[in-house]
Amino acid sequence: MLVGEVKVVGTLPEGPVLLCGNHNSYRDVFLFGMIRSSARLLVHPLVFSFPFLKKWALRWGFVQVSIDDAVALLKQGQTVAICPTGLVEALGDAELPFKTGAVRIAQQAGVPMVPVFFHYGNYPGRWVTPFSITVQNMILFCLWPFYRRGVTIVVGAPMDPAGDVRVRTRELKASVVALKPEVSV
């Protein structure tokens, strides 16, 4: 599934947290487990509409996106992971807006949000931008051996979710983007 080295930079606090990461590959969902092996990932309901995918998603501990279910898991002491954009971004620049669900989940559960940035070793470049997000993702799905070699996972400092949901969502996105490693050309 992965080609190249996987490197995790940073550590998590003890106890339940909401991991909030950028989403530039379908492999991100598995990489949250490199941060905390017991993390439960919130995934799009479409995953559960296909019998084959549903079987594996349940086996891997994925949970259909639901604020109530996520809050319940966190209150049980589990770690939950979410990609607040809800969509895969082909270029890895975290340009899509974050949805407010992550902040609302953390507020209701009373747990910190931990920003996470997945940085893959190779991105396709701007040539894919004329295409829709769906087409970009299909291109990357077909060409993943060329465009997703190795990954660095950067874990940020925990954030208190208290405050205005929209403001905290913007701050969460800024914290995730700030974790992007500097890459020399």
Where are these regions (language model features)?
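Catalytic core of membrane glycerolipid acyltransferases/transacylases, capturing the structured
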Residues: T11-D69, G92-A94, P124
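A cross-family acyltransferase "interaction/gating" segment
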Residues: D93-D164
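Anion (oxyanion) recognition and catalysis
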Residues: L58, L74, Q107
